[in-house]
Protein backbone atom coordinates (compact mmCIF):
# COMPACT_ATOMS: atom_id res chain seq x y z
CA UNK A 1 0.00 0.00 0.00
CA UNK A 2 1.34 3.42 -1.00
CA UNK A 3 0.62 6.91 0.31
CA UNK A 4 -0.09 9.62 -2.26
CA UNK A 5 0.89 13.29 -2.38
CA UNK A 6 0.19 16.13 -4.78
CA UNK A 7 3.05 15.68 -7.24
CA UNK A 8 2.62 19.19 -8.69
CA UNK A 9 4.03 20.81 -5.53
CA UNK A 10 7.53 22.30 -5.67
CA UNK A 11 8.78 21.17 -2.24
CA UNK A 12 8.63 17.63 -0.92
CA UNK A 13 8.60 18.76 2.71
CA UNK A 14 8.57 22.03 4.63
CA UNK A 15 9.32 21.77 8.36
CA UNK A 16 8.32 24.37 10.96
CA UNK A 17 9.71 24.73 14.48
CA UNK A 18 13.00 24.90 16.29
CA UNK A 19 16.55 24.95 15.03
CA UNK A 20 19.08 25.13 17.84
CA UNK A 21 22.53 24.00 18.94
CA UNK A 22 23.55 20.52 20.12
CA UNK A 23 26.77 20.27 22.13
CA UNK A 24 27.57 16.56 22.26
CA UNK A 25 30.10 15.19 24.73
CA UNK A 26 33.28 14.10 22.98
CA UNK A 27 34.35 12.07 26.02
CA UNK A 28 32.19 8.98 26.51
CA UNK A 29 31.44 6.96 29.63
CA UNK A 30 31.77 9.81 32.08
CA UNK A 31 29.36 12.25 33.74
CA UNK A 32 28.97 15.78 32.44
CA UNK A 33 30.74 17.16 35.52
CA UNK A 34 33.92 15.47 34.24
CA UNK A 35 33.38 16.16 30.53
CA UNK A 36 35.66 18.88 29.19
CA UNK A 37 35.08 18.75 25.43
CA UNK A 38 31.91 19.04 23.36
CA UNK A 39 31.33 19.10 19.59
CA UNK A 40 28.84 21.58 18.13
CA UNK A 41 26.07 20.54 15.74
CA UNK A 42 22.77 21.93 14.53
CA UNK A 43 19.94 20.39 16.55
CA UNK A 44 16.22 20.51 17.16
CA UNK A 45 13.79 17.91 15.86
CA UNK A 46 12.30 19.77 12.86
CA UNK A 47 15.74 21.06 11.82
CA UNK A 48 17.17 17.55 12.04
CA UNK A 49 14.26 16.16 10.02
CA UNK A 50 14.74 18.85 7.37
CA UNK A 51 18.47 18.11 7.19
CA UNK A 52 17.87 14.36 7.07
CA UNK A 53 15.26 14.74 4.33
CA UNK A 54 17.56 16.93 2.25
CA UNK A 55 20.44 14.46 2.59
CA UNK A 56 18.09 11.78 1.25
CA UNK A 57 17.45 13.87 -1.84
CA UNK A 58 14.14 15.55 -1.00
CA UNK A 59 13.51 19.21 -1.83
CA UNK A 60 13.21 20.61 1.67
CA UNK A 61 12.32 23.96 3.22
CA UNK A 62 12.32 25.28 6.77
CA UNK A 63 10.25 27.87 8.64
CA UNK A 64 11.66 29.03 11.96
CA UNK A 65 13.34 31.78 13.94
CA UNK A 66 17.02 32.02 14.76
CA UNK A 67 19.01 34.52 16.84
CA UNK A 68 20.89 37.43 15.31
CA UNK A 69 24.28 36.16 16.46
CA UNK A 70 27.04 33.67 15.71
CA UNK A 71 24.91 30.64 16.66
CA UNK A 72 22.07 31.80 14.46
CA UNK A 73 24.39 32.29 11.51
CA UNK A 74 25.96 28.86 12.10
CA UNK A 75 22.50 27.23 12.05
CA UNK A 76 21.40 28.98 8.86
CA UNK A 77 24.67 28.36 7.03
CA UNK A 78 24.83 24.69 7.97
CA UNK A 79 21.24 24.01 6.94
CA UNK A 80 21.64 25.92 3.67
CA UNK A 81 24.82 24.00 2.88
CA UNK A 82 23.00 20.68 3.33
CA UNK A 83 20.46 21.76 0.72
CA UNK A 84 17.64 23.04 2.95
CA UNK A 85 15.91 26.19 1.67
CA UNK A 86 16.35 28.74 4.47
CA UNK A 87 14.57 31.68 2.83
CA UNK A 88 11.79 31.50 5.44
CA UNK A 89 14.09 31.60 8.46
CA UNK A 90 13.24 34.75 10.40
CA UNK A 91 16.00 36.47 12.37
CA UNK A 92 15.17 37.53 15.93
CA UNK A 93 16.08 41.18 16.54
CA UNK A 94 15.08 41.28 20.22
CA UNK A 95 18.07 39.54 21.77
CA UNK A 96 16.61 36.04 22.20
CA UNK A 97 19.20 33.29 21.95
CA UNK A 98 19.40 29.81 20.44
CA UNK A 99 18.40 26.84 22.53
CA UNK A 100 21.39 24.82 23.74
CA UNK A 101 21.40 21.08 24.39
CA UNK A 102 24.39 19.56 26.18
CA UNK A 103 24.49 15.78 25.93
CA UNK A 104 25.96 13.36 28.44
CA UNK A 105 26.96 9.86 27.31
CA UNK A 106 27.51 7.77 30.45
CA UNK A 107 26.97 4.57 28.48
CA UNK A 108 24.98 3.50 25.40
CA UNK A 109 22.00 2.92 27.71
CA UNK A 110 22.50 5.99 29.91
CA UNK A 111 22.35 9.22 27.95
CA UNK A 112 20.90 12.48 29.17
CA UNK A 113 20.42 15.98 27.83
CA UNK A 114 20.89 19.22 29.76
CA UNK A 115 18.70 21.83 28.08
CA UNK A 116 18.90 25.61 28.07
CA UNK A 117 15.52 26.65 26.64
CA UNK A 118 14.55 29.80 28.55
CA UNK A 119 13.23 32.56 26.30
CA UNK A 120 14.71 31.00 23.15
CA UNK A 121 14.43 32.58 19.70
CA UNK A 122 12.58 29.68 18.05
CA UNK A 123 9.55 30.12 20.32
CA UNK A 124 9.22 33.74 19.14
CA UNK A 125 8.27 32.81 15.57
CA UNK A 126 5.21 35.01 14.90
CA UNK A 127 2.14 34.15 12.81
CA UNK A 128 3.01 37.09 10.54
CA UNK A 129 6.29 35.32 9.70
CA UNK A 130 4.47 32.29 8.25
CA UNK A 131 4.18 32.70 4.47
CA UNK A 132 1.04 31.25 2.88
CA UNK A 133 2.51 30.96 -0.62
CA UNK A 134 5.53 29.06 0.72
CA UNK A 135 3.42 26.48 2.54
CA UNK A 136 1.14 26.10 -0.48
CA UNK A 137 4.14 24.98 -2.56
CA UNK A 138 4.89 21.88 -0.45
CA UNK A 139 3.62 18.32 -0.58
CA UNK A 140 3.70 18.20 3.22
CA UNK A 141 4.11 20.40 6.28
CA UNK A 142 6.10 18.83 9.13
CA UNK A 143 5.03 20.14 12.54
CA UNK A 144 7.00 19.50 15.72
CA UNK A 145 5.17 19.25 19.04
CA UNK A 146 7.66 21.40 20.91
CA UNK A 147 6.76 24.41 18.74
CA UNK A 148 3.31 24.36 20.38
CA UNK A 149 4.69 24.91 23.87
CA UNK A 150 4.64 28.72 23.96
CA UNK A 151 3.16 31.75 22.22
CA UNK A 152 3.70 33.20 19.66
CA UNK A 153 5.26 30.04 18.15
CA UNK A 154 2.09 28.15 19.06
CA UNK A 155 -0.12 30.47 17.00
CA UNK A 156 2.39 30.49 14.13
CA UNK A 157 2.18 26.70 13.92
CA UNK A 158 -1.62 26.69 14.14
CA UNK A 159 -1.72 29.23 11.31
CA UNK A 160 0.65 27.06 9.26
CA UNK A 161 -1.60 24.02 9.78
CA UNK A 162 -4.67 26.00 8.68
CA UNK A 163 -2.86 27.18 5.55
CA UNK A 164 -1.69 23.66 4.76
CA UNK A 165 -5.26 22.36 4.99
CA UNK A 166 -6.46 25.22 2.78
CA UNK A 167 -3.95 24.32 0.04
CA UNK A 168 -4.23 20.50 0.18
CA UNK A 169 -0.80 20.14 1.79
CA UNK A 170 -0.47 17.00 3.93
CA UNK A 171 0.09 17.83 7.61
CA UNK A 172 2.60 15.57 9.37
CA UNK A 173 2.70 15.87 13.17
CA UNK A 174 5.88 14.57 14.85
CA UNK A 175 4.95 14.52 18.54
CA UNK A 176 8.49 15.37 19.70
CA UNK A 177 7.55 15.69 23.39
CA UNK A 178 10.11 17.51 25.54
CA UNK A 179 8.78 17.87 29.11
CA UNK A 180 11.07 20.79 30.05
CA UNK A 181 9.27 23.05 27.54
CA UNK A 182 5.75 22.56 28.91
CA UNK A 183 4.11 23.83 32.10
CA UNK A 184 1.55 21.05 32.66
CA UNK A 185 0.37 17.70 31.34
CA UNK A 186 -3.09 19.15 30.70
CA UNK A 187 -1.73 21.97 28.54
CA UNK A 188 0.35 19.53 26.51
CA UNK A 189 -2.60 17.21 25.93
CA UNK A 190 -4.86 20.07 24.77
CA UNK A 191 -2.49 21.43 22.12
CA UNK A 192 -1.16 18.06 20.98
CA UNK A 193 -4.70 16.81 20.48
CA UNK A 194 -5.71 20.02 18.68
CA UNK A 195 -2.99 19.56 16.05
CA UNK A 196 -3.15 15.75 15.88
CA UNK A 197 -6.85 15.92 15.02
CA UNK A 198 -6.02 18.18 12.05
CA UNK A 199 -3.07 16.09 10.84
CA UNK A 200 -2.96 13.57 8.00
CA UNK A 201 0.02 11.65 9.40
CA UNK A 202 0.90 11.40 13.11
CA UNK A 203 4.26 9.96 14.25
CA UNK A 204 5.42 9.33 17.82
CA UNK A 205 6.49 6.85 20.46
CA UNK A 206 3.93 4.99 22.52
CA UNK A 207 4.93 7.14 25.50
CA UNK A 208 4.33 10.32 23.48
CA UNK A 209 0.86 9.16 22.50
CA UNK A 210 0.17 8.59 26.20
CA UNK A 211 1.27 12.19 26.88
CA UNK A 212 -1.09 13.44 24.18
CA UNK A 213 -3.93 11.43 25.69
CA UNK A 214 -2.90 12.42 29.24
CA UNK A 215 -2.94 8.85 30.52
CA UNK A 216 -0.61 5.92 30.99
CA UNK A 217 -0.75 2.48 29.43
CA UNK A 218 -2.77 3.51 26.40
CA UNK A 219 -3.39 1.11 23.53
CA UNK A 220 -2.43 1.61 19.91
CA UNK A 221 -5.90 0.60 18.75
CA UNK A 222 -7.64 3.25 20.86
CA UNK A 223 -5.16 5.91 19.78
CA UNK A 224 -5.53 5.28 16.06
CA UNK A 225 -9.30 4.96 16.14
CA UNK A 226 -9.59 8.35 17.81
CA UNK A 227 -7.36 9.97 15.18
CA UNK A 228 -9.07 8.18 12.29
CA UNK A 229 -12.34 9.77 13.43
CA UNK A 230 -10.74 13.11 12.50
CA UNK A 231 -8.26 13.92 9.69
CA UNK A 232 -5.60 11.25 10.06
CA UNK A 233 -5.25 8.46 7.54
CA UNK A 234 -1.84 7.15 8.67
CA UNK A 235 -0.53 6.79 12.23
CA UNK A 236 2.95 5.54 13.18
CA UNK A 237 3.59 4.38 16.75
CA UNK A 238 7.13 3.44 17.77
CA UNK A 239 7.90 0.89 20.48
CA UNK A 240 11.69 1.15 20.76
CA UNK A 241 13.50 -2.17 20.47
CA UNK A 242 10.18 -3.90 19.78
CA UNK A 243 9.92 -2.07 16.46
CA UNK A 244 7.33 0.28 15.02
CA UNK A 245 3.80 0.01 13.66
CA UNK A 246 1.96 1.93 10.96
CA UNK A 247 -1.84 1.94 10.94
CA UNK A 248 -3.78 3.05 7.88
CA UNK A 249 -7.34 4.33 7.92
CA UNK A 250 -8.28 1.52 5.52
CA UNK A 251 -7.48 -1.01 8.26
CA UNK A 252 -4.01 -2.18 7.26
CA UNK A 253 -1.34 -2.63 9.92
CA UNK A 254 2.37 -2.77 9.09
CA UNK A 255 5.35 -3.51 11.34
CA UNK A 256 9.08 -2.90 11.02
CA UNK A 257 11.67 -4.45 13.30
CA UNK A 258 14.36 -2.45 15.06
CA UNK A 259 17.66 -3.03 13.24
CA UNK A 260 20.63 -4.25 15.24
CA UNK A 261 23.52 -1.87 15.71
CA UNK A 262 26.27 -0.93 18.14
CA UNK A 263 24.54 1.84 20.08
CA UNK A 264 26.67 4.84 21.05
CA UNK A 265 23.85 7.10 22.28
CA UNK A 266 20.07 7.09 22.36
CA UNK A 267 19.17 10.57 21.08
CA UNK A 268 18.56 11.51 17.44
CA UNK A 269 16.78 8.28 16.56
CA UNK A 270 13.31 9.79 16.25
CA UNK A 271 14.37 12.56 13.88
CA UNK A 272 16.26 10.21 11.57
CA UNK A 273 13.33 7.80 11.66
CA UNK A 274 10.88 10.51 10.58
CA UNK A 275 13.03 11.85 7.74
CA UNK A 276 13.65 8.41 6.24
CA UNK A 277 10.06 7.23 6.71
CA UNK A 278 8.72 10.36 4.99
CA UNK A 279 11.33 9.96 2.25
CA UNK A 280 10.03 6.45 1.67
CA UNK A 281 6.44 7.67 1.38
CA UNK A 282 7.13 10.65 -0.88
CA UNK A 283 9.43 8.65 -3.16
CA UNK A 284 6.63 6.20 -3.90
CA UNK A 285 7.63 3.24 -1.75
CA UNK A 286 4.93 1.26 0.03
CA UNK A 287 4.22 1.95 3.69
CA UNK A 288 5.93 -1.22 4.92
CA UNK A 289 9.13 -0.34 3.06
CA UNK A 290 8.97 3.25 4.33
CA UNK A 291 8.82 1.87 7.88
CA UNK A 292 11.95 -0.17 7.21
CA UNK A 293 13.72 2.94 5.95
CA UNK A 294 12.76 4.82 9.11
CA UNK A 295 13.88 2.03 11.41
CA UNK A 296 17.18 1.51 9.59
CA UNK A 297 17.94 5.24 9.59
CA UNK A 298 17.33 5.44 13.34
CA UNK A 299 19.68 2.52 13.87
CA UNK A 300 22.43 4.27 11.91
CA UNK A 301 22.14 7.56 13.80
CA UNK A 302 22.27 6.04 17.30
CA UNK A 303 25.57 4.40 16.34
CA UNK A 304 27.19 7.78 15.60
CA UNK A 305 28.19 10.83 17.63
CA UNK A 306 25.90 13.51 16.21
CA UNK A 307 22.28 13.68 15.12
CA UNK A 308 22.16 16.13 12.19
CA UNK A 309 25.66 15.34 10.90
CA UNK A 310 24.97 11.59 11.11
CA UNK A 311 21.80 11.59 9.01
CA UNK A 312 22.39 8.77 6.50
CA UNK A 313 22.18 8.57 2.72
CA UNK A 314 19.72 6.37 0.86
CA UNK A 315 22.58 4.00 0.00
CA UNK A 316 23.54 3.58 3.68
CA UNK A 317 19.94 2.85 4.64
CA UNK A 318 19.45 0.32 1.86
CA UNK A 319 22.76 -1.36 2.68
CA UNK A 320 21.71 -1.92 6.30
CA UNK A 321 18.27 -3.23 5.30
CA UNK A 322 19.86 -5.67 2.83
CA UNK A 323 22.42 -6.84 5.39
CA UNK A 324 19.76 -7.67 8.00
CA UNK A 325 16.91 -8.87 5.78
Swiss-Prot record:
Gene Ontology BP terms: inositol catabolic process
EC number: 2.7.1.92
GO MF annotation terms: 5-dehydro-2-deoxygluconokinase activity; ATP binding
Pathway(s) the chain acts in: Polyol metabolism; myo-inositol degradation into acetyl-CoA; acetyl-CoA from myo-inositol: step 5/7
Keyword terms: ATP-binding, Kinase, Nucleotide-binding, Transferase
Keyword Kinase assigned: yes
InterPro entries: Carboh/pur_kinase_PfkB_CS, DKG_kinase_firmi, Myo_inos_IolC, Myo_inos_IolC-like_sf, PfkB_Carbo_kinase, PfkB_dom, Ribokinase-like
Catalytic activity line of the entry: 5-dehydro-2-deoxy-D-gluconate + ATP = 6-phospho-5-dehydro-2-deoxy-D-gluconate + ADP + H(+)
Keyword Kinase: yes
Protein function: Catalyzes the phosphorylation of 5-dehydro-2-deoxy-D-gluconate (2-deoxy-5-keto-D-gluconate or DKG) to 6-phospho-5-dehydro-2-deoxy-D-gluconate (DKGP).
HAMAP family cross-referenced by the UniProt entry: IolC (MF_01668)
Family: Belongs to the carbohydrate kinase PfkB family.
Full protein name: 5-dehydro-2-deoxygluconokinase
Organism listed in the record: Bacillus licheniformis (strain ATCC 14580 / DSM 13 / JCM 2505 / CCUG 7422 / NBRC 12200 / NCIMB 9375 / NCTC 10341 / NRRL NRS-1264 / Gibson 46)
Phylogenetic classification of the source organism: Bacteria, Bacillati, Bacillota, Bacilli, Bacillales
Amino acid sequence: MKYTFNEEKEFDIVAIGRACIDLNAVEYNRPMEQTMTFSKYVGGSPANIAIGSSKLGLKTGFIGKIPDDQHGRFIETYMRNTGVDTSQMAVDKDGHKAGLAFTEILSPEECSILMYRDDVADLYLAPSEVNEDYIAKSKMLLVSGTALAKSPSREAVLKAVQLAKKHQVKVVFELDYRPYTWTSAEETAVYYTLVAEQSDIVIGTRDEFDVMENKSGGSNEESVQHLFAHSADLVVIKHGVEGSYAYSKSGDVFRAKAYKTKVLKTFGAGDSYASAFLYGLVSGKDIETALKYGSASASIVVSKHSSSEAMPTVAEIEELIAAQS
